[in-house]
Amino acid sequence: GPHLHFEVRATDSQKPLNPLLYGLPVNDRQRPQIQKLILYYPQQNSVLTPSKRLTLQKVNDSTYQTPLIMTSGKIGLGIQMFDRQDLSYNRNGIYQAIMEVNGKKVVNYKFDTLNYSDSDKLFVIVDYPKFKNERYKVVKLFFQNQKPLTFIKSMVNEGMIDIVIGKSYQIKLTLKDFSGNSTHVEMYVEGKKKEIKAKPLDGKLIEPHLEYFFPLDDQDVFIPKNTFFEDAVIEIKKEGNILSIGPNLFPFDNPYEIRFKTNKQDSLQLRQTFIAKKTDKKDYYLPTVLKDGFWVSQVAEMGDYKLARDSVPPEIKAYNFKPEQWLSKFKFLNIKISDDISGIKNYRGTINGKWVLFEYEPKRNLLTYDFSDNDFDLTKHDLRVEVEDNVGNKTIYETVFFRK
């Protein structure tokens, strides 16, 4: 629901700053915790980066080791991790991550300031397939073919380590929180010949600097330049009235466009029709416009899409009162509203013909009016609530209540 965030920002740039830099007292004796350590094999001709999870062996309270790694070629590392403070179970991010190879610093992430322009690019350093398909977040300590983010203080060779056959390497990871608590991982790598095979993907290679148009009878897909951060492979299929686009393995920089050709229908049917994302549970409304004989929607995710229609108006019900009830002792007036197909677009409430503020809580489908907002001279009050869904269907609820 609605809530408030406080931020400390630099006056000149408006960049968010780490508030702990300004002496806020926080009790913290807990070390950052590592949940998973992932070894990646970045390859020149592979769109998807092969990876494997490494076993972590606890040496003491602050140090872990991995078994000896024997491989060759370029490797990178990724970590699933979190940090806690005393007296709190919240899982926070860490303050600093450092990677050293043979005693030399290769990567240094430090979260003392952020840039809002970074927020759209954070999925570049997150293992996107694992996040979308396995629901956990691994932060990669390598960063290919991209402009550095604000919190990347230093990075050598894009954070990748080139393992040469016959040579040995010591890799040390250090995770720190702001209070100085730290956790370490020690790794030893021996250069041995090893062939890493990338998983092949079916579909069309999409290069970020090009645009693509895919016509499919009465459905089209348009992918502008810079839709993806990096090269992607996508497969587009038309299965009956379903437009299927996948796989869900690549992060988006910008949305792309899907189009469904309009049929000869009356104006009401046209207005009530929209593009929906199809899931196992339900069809989800997507903002849709009519353009040049097509229904058009901008999307920034893979999935199955179809045309849907919503001819059912929203529902409105009294929640904590009954019509013609005395409400003199009530502090709030609650109205339940819902629309199971395209969803609520807007609402408006009046009492005795005068607009009043209703606060909307979408998770509970609840409108709430605070009686302390207004004083009324009369005892009989006419309530009117109008709700409109995303395709323009409307419902009006009118009733009377009494209050001194």
Where are each of the predicted segments found?
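Long, low-complexity serine/threonine/glycine- and acidic-rich segments characteristic of extracellular
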Residues: 42-45, 52-193, 340-404
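Proteolytic processing hotspots in large secreted/extracellular or virion-associated proteins
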Residues: 196-209, 230-274
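Proteolytic-maturation and junctional protease-sensitive modules
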Residues: 223, 247-305, 346-348, 355-357
